Regions:
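Gly-rich Lys/Arg/Thr-decorated short loops/hinges at beta-loop-alpha junctions or inter-strand turns
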Residues: 110-125, 222-226
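Short acidic, glycine/serine/threonine-rich loops at helix termini
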Residues: 100-104, 162-167, 190-196, 266-269, ...
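Gly/Ser/Thr-rich loops at beta-strand to alpha-helix junctions
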Residues: 94-95, 154-162, 185-188, 262-263, ...
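Long terminal accessory regions outside catalytic cores
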Residues: 1-83
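Loop/turn positions that initiate beta-strands
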Residues: 83-91
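Glycine-rich phosphate/diphosphate-binding loops that line cofactor/substrate pockets in enzymes
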Residues: 135-150, 171, 247, 282-287
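C-terminal functional extensions of proteins
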Residues: 204-254, 259-290, 295-364
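Active-site histidine-anchored catalytic micro-motif
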Residues: 150, 172, 177-223, 292
Length: 364
């Protein structure tokens, strides 16, 4: 099996319905963070806007945001970030009536029916066969390693298993990880595993509780705060394994978003939810593949800020692949209806998932 990137089919704007469509209307923002009445809200699909007779694509889109027309460019801006004077696109139709066109079928494959491998609106559960999904994902990762940007969104479950930590470390070291987004817990327990060989006080191989082990993650946080940064903590304590260690060693960017339940937190964790969301969106702006693992909150947040397409530097429009993996069917199904070429789901234990992928890619 060899991965081939689907071709994007742009709308034919020579058709009368596009030629006859009006230019988009805009209205200014009067109050910071408040969109004007009848603002247009974006989806994950490619959306075109008619400006001065030309249909323009909003290149860096996301769900549930406004479109600002600025110097002939279309900027997709979260409503909370709107500023007075911003010219916001108006209209709530999507077939050209308001100069707005939503293009949901840009990646169709001619000669293929809707049982295509990338049509995801179908039930998937623990009983689904995922052999083909793993094969497709591994081919995709081989392609993205060279041609794209793979961002991993991870919950703390990885840190509780020695094999999963080793597999993810190998993925980083072999170039399959270009960005990591997580919370305080993943980083804390991964560093705990490196320093004490425990996670929440349990040995990460035998799962046996260690004496006073419930102090271990708190000690890690305390020591890291004493060091002043995670990289300095790694150096000060001669950390030589784990997910966070490998990301730091290989200069893989990390975004750690805090929450109200965090201990500590570690230095570098972003405590302001909206600053964290902004940092996450900055990381996924040029991502071409996003893999979300065992974290419902971060998965939904990432899915909402990630469109189903990416515009490359040369103007090529390609699909953006999103995978969500969790042992809970409810979690993965939260993103199942985001659309074709948008979310692929696998219901499984994430420790087993990463080990299968790493072995399939022959990095362990």
């Amino acid at each position: 099996m060899s991965f081939k990137l689907p071709v994007y089919h742009a709308p034919d704007f020579s058709q009368p319905k596009f030629q006859d469509a009006p230019n988009v209307q805009t209205a200014p923002v009067l109050q910071a963070g408040v969109a004007p009445e009848n603002y247009h809200s974006t989806s994950m699909f490619p959306e075109y806007f008619k400006v001065n007779g030309q249909w323009l694509l909003a290149k860096e889109s996301r769900m549930d945001s406004s479109v600002v027309l600025q110097d002939g460019q279309l900027l997709v801006v979260e409503n909370r970030n709107l500023q007075p004077g911003d010219q916001v696109v108006l209209g709530r139709t999507e077939q050209g009536e308001d100069g707005i066109y939503l293009h949901a079928n840009g990646f169709y494959e001619e000669g293929r029916d809707h049982d295509d491998q990338f049509v995801f609106r179908q039930g998937r559960s623990r009983e689904t066969s995922y052999a083909r999904d793993y094969d497709e994902l591994m081919e995709l990762l081989r392609y993205e390693k060279v041609h794209g940007k793979v961002v991993w969104v991870m919950g703390p479950a990885f840190a509780f298993d020695s094999d999963a930590r080793a597999a993810m470390q190998a993925m980083v070291e072999n170039g399959y990880v270009h960005g990591l987004m997580a919370g305080n817990a993943l980083a804390t327990h991964d560093l705990e595993g490196a320093l004490f060989h425990t996670a929440l006080g349990q040995d990460i191989y035998t799962q046996r509780p260690q004496p006073n082990g419930h102090y271990n993650h708190l000690d890690v946080i305390n020591l890291a705060r004493q060091s002043g940064s995670i990289p300095q903590f790694i150096q000060d304590h001669n950390i030589q394994d784990g997910i966070i260690y490998s990301c730091v060693a290989h200069h893989v960017p990390i975004v750690l978003a805090g929450s109200i339940r965090d201990d500590g937190p570690l230095p570098g964790v972003i405590g302001d939810a909206y600053q964290a969301a902004g940092a996450m969106r900055d990381m996924v702006r040029d991502a071409t593949c996003v893999i979300c693992l065992a974290t419902m909150l971060h998965t939904i947040a990432t899915g909402n800020m990630t469109p189903c397409f990416r515009v490359l530097a040369d103007g090529t429009i390609r699909p953006l692949y999103i995978y969500t993996v969790d042992a809970d069917e409810f979690v993965v199904n939260k993103l199942l209806d985001r659309g074709s070429l948008s979310a692929k789901t696998i219901v499984t234990n994430v420790q087993d998932f990463i080990t299968i992928v790493a072995r399939g890619l022959k990095v362990i």
